[in-house]
Amino acid sequence: MALFRKFFLKKTPDRLLEISERVYVFDCCFSTDSMGEDEYRDYLSGIVAQLQDYFPDASFMVSNFWSGDKRSRISDILSEYDMTVMDYPQQYEGCPLLQLEMIHHFLKSCENWLSVEGQHNMLLMHCERGGWPVLAFMLAGLLLYRKTYTGEQKTLEMVYKQARRDFIQQFFPLNPQSSHMRYLHYITRQGSGPEKPPISRPLILDSIVLHVVPRFDAEGGCRPYLRVHGQDSSSSNKSAKVLYEMPKTKKHLQRYGQAEVPVKVGAFCRVQGDVVLECIHIGDNLDHEEIMFRVMFNTAFIQSNILGLNRDDIDVSWNSNNQFPRDFRAEVVFSDPGSFKPAAATVEEVDDDGDETDVASVDTGEEFYEAEEDWHDARRDPETQSTDGRTSIGDAELDGGVSREDSGSLEKHRADEDVKIVISQNLGCMSDRPVSAPAEILGNPGGLQQACENEEMPKLSNRSDQDDNAVQDIQVVAASVDSEGHKFGSICQKEDMKGVIAQTLVTAIDPSCSDEVQCQPDESAKILKYPNLDYTGFSSPRTLSSVDEDTRLGTIPNVALQNADVKIITESTVIVDNELVIYEEKTIVDNGNLTQEVKNVVNEESTTPKLDRSVIESVDSQDNKNHKMEVAKAADTTDSKMEQTKLKSGLEDAISLKKTTVQGSIVVLPATEIATKIKTKREESGGRRDVGISLPQSKIEARAKSPRISSDRRQIPDKVVPSKKMPVDHAPEAVLLEEKLGNSDQSQEQPKAVKPKTVRRWISPNKESETTSVHRPSHPPSRYDSSPAALAIHSMHTNNKFNVGKDAPLVSSGAQAVPKIQAAPPPPPPPPPPYASSSSLSMHMGSATKQQPPPPPPPPPLPPPPPPPASSGLSSIPPPPPPPPLMSFGAQTRTFVPPPPPPPPPPRSGVGGNTPPAPPPPPLRSTVPAISPPPPPPPPPLKPSSGAPCPPPPPPPPPPPPPSAPSSRAFSSAPPPPPPPPLLRSVPPPPPPPPISHSNAPPPPPLPAARFNAPPPPPPPPTTHFNAPPPPPPPPITRSGAPPSPPPPPSPPPPPPPPGARPGPPPPPPPPGARPGPPPPPPPPGGRPSAPPLPPPGGRASAPPPPPPPSTRLGAPPPPPPPGAGGRAPPPPPAPGGRLGGPPPPPPPGGRAPPPPRGPGAPPPPGGNPSSLIGRGRGVVRASGSGFGAAAARKSTLKPLHWIKVTRALQGSLWEELQRNDDSQSVSEFDLSELESLFPAAVPKPNDSSKSDSRRKSLGSKPEKVHLIELRRANNTEIMLTKVKMPLPDLVSAALALDQSTLDVDQVENLIKFCPTKEEMELLKNYTGDKENLGKCEQFFLELMKVPRMESKLRVFSFKIQFGSQVADLRKSLNTIDSSCDEIRSSLKLKEIMKKILLLGNTLNQGTARGAAVGFRLDSLLKLTDTRATNNKMTLMHYLCKVLAAKSSQLLDFYMDLVSLEATSKIQLKMLAEEMQAVSKGLEKVQLEYNASESDGPVSEIFREKLKEFTDNAGADVQSLSSLFSEVGKKADALIKYFGEDPVRCPFEQVISTLLTFVTMFRKAHEENRKQAELDKKRAEKEAEAEKSKAQLASKNDSKPSNPSRQVKQTPDTKTRAASRRGKDVG
């Protein structure tokens, strides 16, 4: 054995503990002693010398855990030996753990160090005093990380056991094992693969919910106080700090008892990374603090925004067993970072039928706020998660909720997502600050200030010379969240505008939104100058990055607002299936008064107001470069005052505006979806460019799904809001929105039609306007009941003036002038914009004074609602898909590819619906030398006479309508206000044209053909005065949200009339009081257009039919609906006389417009029940008949026999024989009638009230159980009750009788766990139905509720059951300790051995400072085994045993005197103290419940009797146990002092543990000495025998006589063999 040990036993260097291969720990880590400087240096030097001796070729790295802030002592010393020392802290915010990032660094560095090939690297672990807990954790983590061990619990406990049990308790008041286990789970979950730790996501720590109240005061309750430590995510400093601390006031620090669960303690703070949460109990005087528990976690591993905690998941004090029951449960609740609510502003949340609107009022009304968002390209990666980004500009913060995102992506909890509307207006002077909306102010000779942005953050300069009517700093910010979790937004700023509309749309999934929005331009866009127009760069961002904490609206600098009559119309929006829907109220700011008004009916009589011409152009390059919107405004309009209107406002602070003349300019940004592109037109320098945004004001309750257009393109719904009650001297200004799709490399000389991805909704011109919804669903559009579609408004450049009919919604279309009059090349086909309202008119900008109406394209998809009744239905129209690019743009080419007729308008009274975008129409071929405006975007304006250049359209070529003759005069359109549209001046409205006055026939834009295969109907003949308007948008889809694609027209319509034809002016508008109809459909070429009659939609019809034949009554001709899924189209609308009839689309010149065919399953004609369409897929109405398919298969009248059928008989089988015989099936032996009577098939019974009860009883059906309790908890309760097999009343009686024979402790604990909570009790108390119908769980709760404080009584019962065993165990343990103390002190043999050891030590240390000792510390006994002899075969312990065995053998069995020593080593006095305290407090609670039950009445009489008996006996037991505990404690302290130790530094457990270890090593050494002695004895005996045999053999050989004859004969070989034989014998 000794030889085996010599060769195979690996010896560990002294003073080092080997944890695993090449991993050692300094033994000073297990001691509480502190060494002096010299002693410490000697200690380390001795260890280093041993290491260099044992491992001469090894390299060493030391990981040191210490609490200093300078260079550690061990670093200074070991650096002299070329050892690398890594210093780590000992704790993180009071918890013996390190940050996850630091843990990962430690693990990776150690793994790399130990894994270097070809080198013998060793890792040494060291800690200073108090660092053992974190060192133990890091060791366990390293062993798990390297997969040396598996199992977190087992590994951690193994490392803990390297030190004595109470070692950690000396340094930390709380047991850190729970947090250690949590972080070990983090390590094992992460594995050894990733190079970096997981990214910790920011969260908002909302609150902590205690489902069980800890018992920390005399009454069994607590006063919780929270403190949160962690890193400040907003600071670059990584050091931790207190992130949240509750105020120490009576108001916040409330006491909670056991009956008040659950307790929710709020802690609203932002956390990220490693967080330490401390829950502290505050005494009644608010001064005393006692920590209840602590939790350390990392936010990277928080799932579902909840961290569940039980008794084993929290760090509690070492003696808190009774304070936290076994069923303790708590939850730390988080939310996404957007829910962080600073106190800068207030938020008012309105929840209306699922549509939530948060209106945040900015604190100061003198600042204009700007929201910014970070964007990324959604076209390339629509599914990608957006990244975090935030930029704050401005001084004020907008307080609201934050859109919730999971792991960077937005979760969509419902079809309709909430959208926030923030109204902000800059007032007064502001300090210079950069504005995120990229704009560059360029001065124009004509006074034009134009904002250009070229990927930089310009500043808006303040104009001190503004006139009193100048309105400055207009911002429109729109952002929406699509279903894929992306946000889009835009910022528009404008200076010196007379019509000011500031509207901010911020999307949020929940009603609270406080996102920080950043808008970053992607590409520079050119904004050319107009002499009298102001432009503001509008940046349309692409993707909203993950929303950060708050939304800050930065003020626009250096802007003064003077004398402004400003009208701000804001509309709440909702994202419904990737669509932006405007749905709630209008906010009007008038002369400093900000009010809000929500109307259910659009009813407004408006006079013709003067409006400045303003155009907002949104540019989004197809190559993900830039989004821009410009607001162009004529400066030459006259001033008009708004009528002051007060509306109810959700904003707390009114935005004060100075008096300014506002001409009703309205700007609304579209909320874009993934891959949304905003089309723009660019010009060469010096060229012009207009863009319009049409803003429908709408209110919706729409649900729709958004389709994915080819190339992942999306369409943006736009809104047209007519200004309310604004007198107009000339045509009101219109705002057009256009989107640009396609390449930006198109020719600058040829204007391209731009397809606006917008949907216009008609605003009824009634006095009280009702908002209608704009929504783009994801499927092909279908028709449903909704407001009529808005008309497209075309813009032309005319004398730099832009006139629009007042109160008419404007259609987005862009026009640009290039230096030469040329047809615009076809940009990518954008969907034509639907027209905003029945009264909306085409707008054109041009230099000519005359207006030439372009040929009207097919009627717009949706007709306006009948003027008299205000429509209450909510609907939204999606923008149609982009039309194909124009086929050709010849100078005089007059032929067009006929687009399909526009879809008919859906009935208007329907309540909610979304319209999908229609497919793009085929490319149009424009032949007129005048500009050919794209159907969706406004055609580029032409000034042939003046030679104004037509700017090239944006890269995506939407099919422009045929170019019209040059117009010399700005075309003005009169958009009607809500329902009764007042006729305005000279503007022909588009397809669902509103009544117009002084205007040419409105050109309805062609409807884009679905899938680009159906040619659009021919546009109306171009008028000589203005360009063709954009095509109308597709009709809204059915309520189900699935739009049918438009049916292809039976035959393409003939080409439009030649441009030379000049239509007459449209009929004059009806008087404002009259019920005006939409403009007439376009006349045939050469003819004068007549106003089409407006079909009054009557009832709520689902899908709009194709346009009916024109009737005498004015109405918007409804375009044909797009074909639905599967090519089915809605039926044509009824004749105009009908409820929803409308004029047919304009007939093509010389030909008839093809009526859209109605495929099977198409939506019924308008007037039908809208409910029939609800819930149908793809927006196609499926025919459902009760008898449909009934005859398809005959149903058996007999019950089926569920056997396994054999279809093929195997040869030789029974079935094969039966088949051969074929007589088994010939004649049936069974009576069919008898079978039908006995085994009839189950048939549904008619619901006859008179016989329903009897029939149900006959069928044996059970009444449905009513479940009030949460399903999972109810199921768990019922499972528990199945284990207690007795009726509920008997169960409660047994518990009250404290019957231990019926219920054991586990069953009682389960009953306690499933006692009803306070909320559940209230729920059951409020139930008024039949209690027999309640579920088993509810009945169990009701049974428990019959007894007051049943949970408390059950806890008393549980205590009573366990009391006897607890007292017996305590008494046994105390007696064991008492016996052990007596045995140790009375052992004479132990005393004699201690004396021998003292003599031995003094002998070894003679002449040194350690010599002449009068005693030694108890732990010096363990050093006997560390001191080895020079031959490494013996230690001092072996020597001691050898000497004792030789001279004092009677002492060798001294351990026989210490019989109780081993049992005592398993007992901890602290644990006994805790158990003793638990017994005492438990008995006190029993007494309290006994006293409280006096008032319970008869129900608790038996309980009180049983409890009285128990308390009398238990009191005596506890008293005697307390005295025994006190006596044992004194003996333990005396034993510690007996060995000369300090009870404070050396606890009783350490003394017992040291003595037991010494006894074990002594016995082991003695046994080894005995075995070695036996081996030596045997070896000696064997050697003696060998010597004896040698001697005998030698004497025998010498005694033999010699034989000369034989000697002569012997050869040399024989002599050699003999000699060798003799040698063997001797051996």
Curated annotation (Swiss-Prot):
UniProt GO molecular function: phosphoprotein phosphatase activity
Domain C2 tensin-type: 200-337
Chain positions covered by the region annotation Disordered: 370-413, 680-787, 801-1181, 1241-1261, 1571-1627
Keywords noted in UniProt: Hydrolase, Protein phosphatase
Biased composition regions of type Basic and acidic residues, renumbered to the chain: 402-413, 681-691, 700-717, 726-742, 1248-1261, 1571-1590, 1612-1627
Compositional bias (Pro residues): 824-835, 852-870, 877-886, 897-908, 931-965, 974-1168
Ranges of Polar residues composition bias in the record: 1600-1611
Signal peptide start-end: none
Domain Phosphatase tensin-type: 5-194
Family named by the database record: Belongs to the formin-like family. Class-II subfamily.
Protein name per Swiss-Prot or TrEMBL: Formin-like protein 5
